[in-house]
Amino acid sequence: MMAADDYDLAGFTVGLVDKPKLIDSSRMAAGDVVLALPSSGFHSNGYSLVRKVFDVEKADLGKYYDELGETLGEALLRPTVIYVKPVLKVLEEVDVKGISHITGGGFYENIPRSLKKGCCARIKKEDVRTPALFHLMQKTGS
């Protein structure tokens, strides 16, 4: 139950695409390139785990972390980047054959869903830059 002066805020987005512009992976082929956009943070779905880890560890939100370049609270309050504009720009310039939204399941659960049957993706781990906030949470929640 919520207190009388509390409120719950929620939102959602609905997308629409013309059928000829649907991206369905049917044209994927060996040798295609994987492009990636960097993560800006935990985003909305990740905050349940963030709260759990930092609550259990009684993290000080006002503490400054050199690796973050700011306090933990400032880092956690940074607004989520909305990727629609950079994605639309790529769609204008490149023949995109698949798109994968990397969520809680990470690469292993999300990328295969966007691949054509029989195709695989090779991701070089050393080319993936993980934000410092992710490393801090992993270290804190170990």
What is the role of each PLM region?
Residues 1-48:
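Glycine-rich anion-binding loops of enzyme active sites
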Residues 23, 54, 112-114:
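Ubiquitous "structural anchor" signal
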Residues 28-74:
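Acidic, glycine-rich loop-and-beta core segments that form the ion-binding/anion-interacting portion
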